[in-house]
Amino acid sequence: MVLIRVLANLLILQLSYAQKSSELVIGGDECNINEHPFLVLVYYDDYQCGGTLLNEEWVLTAAHCNGKDMEIYLGVHSKKVPNKDVQRRVPKEKFFCDSSKTYTKWNKDIMLIRLDRPVRKSAHIAPLSLPSSPPSVGSVCRVMGWGTITSPQVTLPDVPRCANINLLDYEVCRAAYPELPATSRTLCAGILEGGKDSCGGDSGGPLICNGQFQGIVSWGGDPCAQPHEPGLYTNVFDHLDWIKGIIAGNTDVTCPL
């Protein structure tokens, strides 16, 4: 069974103040308040996602995080005790690889959001650069977000959790999920023995490998963090031409096949 890694926002009021679990994303630790100035919190249609600030006007997230009445919060660490520099924005425009907004669990799960007005940089708000080189299997990657820290039961944290996982060969994910095609524009990342993983509510957030922004949280096993069931992440490097083209104003640019 697989899980698209969004989480109903309806649970936030009920669970965001739940007792902290020894399982901290899952299997991680509380992120340092200064290590995620690019991480954004996205609410839509009673759901929660993450995202990444690329510059003062643009956020990159997963296509399956699209919905009505989207709100984007920047500079967030604790949801209970907000930083003084938290900023709220809404989308001005949304861009998808396919004009019909279609995507699959292994293709085109990527969305660019142009914000309604520029973001002001601050102590807790700063963009993350796009990757300058492709990802390498074996890299140590950092995943982060406000998603559930337990699975299948839901326990939402007050502050984002961070975990180190490994970039794995795509064939590892094909073995775990036979429905995957022979090739795709997704990355496979996790811990083979399980215990660390992104999960529900982390969708759209970044996967940072060797210091470079290489992936977008997309989907994975359900429950999360099971042995030999890594997560799938949209490959950012493969979509660089599309991302840069849209930001530059070229709306005719096409996504890779």
UniProtKB/Swiss-Prot annotation:
It is an enzyme of class 3 (hydrolase). Keywords: Disulfide bond, Fibrinogenolytic toxin, Hemostasis impairing toxin, Hydrolase, Protease, Secreted, Serine protease, Signal, Toxin, Zymogen. One of its GO terms (biological process) is proteolysis. Its EC number is 3.4.21.-. Residues 1-18 form the signal peptide. One of its GO terms (cellular component) is extracellular region. It is found in: Secreted. InterPro entries: Peptidase_S1_PA, Peptidase_S1_PA_chymotrypsin, Peptidase_S1A, Trypsin_dom, TRYPSIN_HIS, TRYPSIN_SER. Snake venom serine protease with fibrinogenolytic activities. Cleaves beta-chain of fibrinogen (FGB) efficiently and shows relatively lower activity on alpha-chain. Negative results: does not have activity on gamma-chains of fibrinogen (FGG). Belongs to the peptidase S1 family. Snake venom subfamily. This is Beta-fibrinogenase mucrofibrase-2. The lineage of its organism: Eukaryota, Metazoa, Chordata, Craniata, Vertebrata.
